[in-house]
Structures are given as structure tokens and as C-alpha cells.
């Protein structure tokens, strides 16, 4: 569950470091390596972007499935799209569970 969330962060780190600085693997091991880190967005912005990406992935999988029904896509393309959508959904579920757990812990705190 945590691995899926960390892999999302790794993909964004790789995208940021492409074309500049040392190899992406070096910046994954040492976050300070490479170029100066850009300003991170707010937590709500990051969650919004992840949600948008998950929805886009699921719509893409649905579209690929419909193409396969019409005979325009092969089985491998459908499986790849559906597996990508499933991974996005599992990540969203894991984040939701963590947020609910954190909320319940805060609600149980004594003031």
C-alpha cells in the first residue's frame, strides 16, 4: 500500500529531473541531488492532481475496453489499461483509508 504511494512520488521526481542534473536514480536516493527542488504545491492540489490522473486512467481503460469490443484494440492493450486503472484505484483507496484513520484518531483525542 505504501509502495504504491511512494511510486507515485518517484514518478513525479523522475519527471522533474529529466534532462537536467544527475541520473534520476541518484535523485531518488538523495532528494537533494540534482537541481534545486521546485516549490511543492499544497496538499489539496497534490490530491486533486492524483484524483484527476486516476479518473483519466479509468476513463482510458474504459475506452480501450470499448475499442476491444469493437475489434479495434488487442487484448494486451486492454489488460495494460485495466491494470493501470486498477493500480490507480488501489492507490486512491489506500489514501482514503489513511485519511479516514487519521480523522478517527483525531476525533478520539482528548482535549
UniProtKB/Swiss-Prot annotation:
Record-stated family: Belongs to the FliE family.
Keyword Ribonucleoprotein: no
Protein name, UniProt field: Flagellar hook-basal body complex protein FliE
InterPro entries cross-referenced by the UniProt entry: FliE
Domain of life: Bacteria
GO biological process: bacterial-type flagellum-dependent cell motility
GO CC annotation terms, alphabetical: bacterial-type flagellum basal body
Keyword annotations of the record: Bacterial flagellum
Keyword Cell inner membrane carried by entry: no
GO terms for MF: cytoskeletal motor activity; structural molecule activity
Main location: other
Compartments, record wording: Bacterial flagellum basal body
